[in-house]
């Protein structure tokens, strides 16, 4: 997979283009708060969240819309892992 193309759509939503298609990602203030990410880091949050998801499933299996609150609710380790990745990237 090549690096995803991340395009801000406004209102905390991003269009992510992958080799196997595209998906929209919604970054929520709660996930930002829980990861200690600044609002200016939203695109980086999207990139790292997608990397995390793609370690667990193929790009072809990603839904057309991803809400990071839903990922956090479905995967108890998501927010902690994302916070660690953000800290390592700084």
Task: Describe each region flagged by the PLM.
Residues 2-35, 72-89:
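N-terminal intrinsically disordered, cationic/polar leader segments
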Residues 35-43:
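Ordered, soluble secondary-structure elements with a strong preference for glycine-centered loop motifs
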Residues 42-87:
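Acidic, low-complexity intrinsically disordered segments
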């Amino acid at each position: 997979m090549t690096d995803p193309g991340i395009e801000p759509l406004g209102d905390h939503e991003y269009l992510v283009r992958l080799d196997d298609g595209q998906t929209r990602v919604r970054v929520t203030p709660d996930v930002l708060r829980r990861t200690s990410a600044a609002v200016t880091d939203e695109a980086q949050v999207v990139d790292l969240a997608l990397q995390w998801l793609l370690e667990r499933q193929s790009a072809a299996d990603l839904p057309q819309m991803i809400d990071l609150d839903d990922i956090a609710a479905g995967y108890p380790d998501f927010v902690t892992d994302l916070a660690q990745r953000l800290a390592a990237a700084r």
